[in-house]
């Protein structure tokens, strides 16, 4: 299918003067959030556990927070790398103190910490899942988000700002059981956090939204299929549903559009997909397409509708 030229989410100056922090920005959607916010002119603090000198439990030395910060600056913003383990409250307190000392406020917080792909035991019963691995998933997907929000949101409420919780799966999809109790809880919690934080933030003029990408062409996913961003369609022979996959930039453009929207309060408390945001704001993926992966899964994969994946991009 031929698509039109790529359409960005915002102008190069839409977020000029804004201060953003992307927690979990080493790779994948997190890196893209940081870069796209930077491309709109924001100053972006990028955090994560993998640095030039240390590799996290994810086990990928190929992406670092320093590299992400450099990409933010290259895109037109100011990238600031702050290596941080968001499960350590003291490290997050130091991070908050640095942002306060530098700018006195925070306008955009993207809570994207995870790094638990290597722990997911699809199809395994609770009692067959090693307890330490299951609890680690909850640490990475829930506890880290609570620590981050608790210690950084006091900076965000000083001026009307945007808090984004990031999960995997639409609200409709996450109402289904996600094949393992620990993983299910880890991915449903951000949806509930956004709903609860919406009430907490509204009196301060701030907004909380939960956002999910679709079938994400992250570095890790591409490596798993043995393809690159250039030849990713070669993976369709192994996984036909990958035809609705999207680049990390797509969901990141959605978050950038939210951040630049003075009327974003209408999204407060909602859980939205990259496809929904693209339909609302008119941006596209980097190849000019507009994937709607979760609608495809709901209607075709789960719902039995007879339609091909190309009609959902």
Q: Can you annotate each of these PLM segments?
A:
Residues 2-103, 114-127, 133:
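Short-chain dehydrogenase/reductase
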Residues 18, 77-78, 105-106, 155-169, ...:
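Active-site loop of short-chain dehydrogenase/reductase
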Residues 40, 102-103, 116-121, 151-160, ...:
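A short helix-coil junction within the Rossmann-fold of NAD(P)-dependent oxidoreductases
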Residues 115-119, 127-131, 137, 157-203, ...:
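Catalytic loop of short-chain dehydrogenase/reductase
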Residues 210, 230-313:
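C-terminal helical subdomain
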Residues 149-150, 195:
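A short, exposed helix-loop element centered on a Lys and neighboring polar residues
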Residues 33, 196-206, 262-265:
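Active-site-adjacent segment of SDR/Rossmann-fold oxidoreductases
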